[in-house]
Curated annotation (Swiss-Prot):
The key enzymatic reactions in nitrogen fixation are catalyzed by the nitrogenase complex, which has 2 components: the iron protein (component 2) and a component 1 which is either a molybdenum-iron protein, a vanadium-iron, or an iron-iron protein. Its EC number is 1.18.6.1. It comes from the Bacteria. The gene is anfG. Its cofactor is iron-sulfur cluster. It catalyses: N2 + 8 reduced [2Fe-2S]-[ferredoxin] + 16 ATP + 16 H2O = H2 + 8 oxidized [2Fe-2S]-[ferredoxin] + 2 NH4(+) + 16 ADP + 16 phosphate + 6 H(+). This is Nitrogenase iron-iron protein delta chain. Hexamer of two alpha, two beta, and two delta chains.
Amino acid sequence: MEDPSKVQLNQLTDYIMKNCLWQFHSRKWDRERQNEGILTKTKQILLGEEVDLSTPADRCYYADALCLADAYKTEYPWINDMSKDELIQLMQQLKDRIDYVTITGSLNAELTDPRY
């Protein structure tokens, strides 16, 4: 039987990979900032924490995070029953996975091309 936490991580990752266009920024630094911004704000929304909206970038990431958090709560109702610590751990694992898939493990040479 597969580990339930891996199943949950795979479901959240799969949702992003199939439904979120923000993962396709063309530069490494764009992807790093967006992954950090969107996934941090998604975690804050899911935890009911206050979200920083002080900059235009914060507000942009918030818009994507709000959609992602709403989708997660609807598509994966188990997320609503997680403890704060479980959710924090899962969201960190998700960020690590998305960073790997979209940045460090990506074969897209444009991500590191200094002329692009």
